Amino acid sequence: KGNMTLAEFEEQQQLLAYFKLAEIEPSKQAGGGSAANTMFTFASLGGKPFYACRVGDDAQGEFYLKDLHTTGVATSKKSVHTGSVTGSCVVAVTEDGERTMQTYLGTSSDITAENVDFDALTQADWLYLEGYLAMTESIQPAMIKLRQQAGIHNAKIAVSFADPAVVKFAKDGLLNMLGNKVAVIFCNSEEAKLFTDKKQIKAAARALLEHCQTAVVTDGANGAIIAHKSDDHSEL
């Protein structure tokens, strides 16, 4: 309860079948995901985001892309992979407000450079990368090319660590994503401490400035700490 569990396609179908037997029908279907939610919020604030992803040529994939387009998030035809199954997440919410999730990644776990429209970056001011991609080996060549293209077109890079598990199990992938340095890092206090090996949030935020110009570290009910480096000094 309260956690997210990864599942295979058959396990996802078994769970849905169980809910059906228990006469529990899905109350809502909606697009989601770490980076997709960020793009949705950005579009809601008046931005014009482009989102690179990978879905199947099935009903769920069609719904997902339509949901993004309706909210003002642009995508590419390269996002659709023929003959594959779109990932999904079953979210059960109990009366106490706890969310328990089972996620089937589907074809999204096989995203490669073929699913990325690099031309979209030529008109972008920012390139936003989510930390979960650090755990996907097939996307690493595209990550390198995206960083190179961002440099060519003077686009700033922002990276979200996404989850403590990413820092624990894919730190090398995160370091590859960060390269020499990025403009902004977004993470929570646990992720910041894990990444920097610091015990205090302020020390962790300052240590992150070795990899970025600005670090935004959220801390639950305590709000957030923003560390910024300019010239030869840093400030919180």
Question: What are the roles of these predicted feature ranges?
Answer:
Residues R54-G56:
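Alpha-helical transmembrane segments within multi-pass membrane transporters and channels
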Residues K1-E8, P26-A30, E62-G87, V91-L236:
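Ribokinase/PfkB-type carbohydrate-kinase core domain
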Residues K1-F50, E62:
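Glycine-rich phosphate/adenosyl-contacting loop at the front of the ribokinase-like
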Residues G46-A52, D232-L236:
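Phosphate-handling active-site elements
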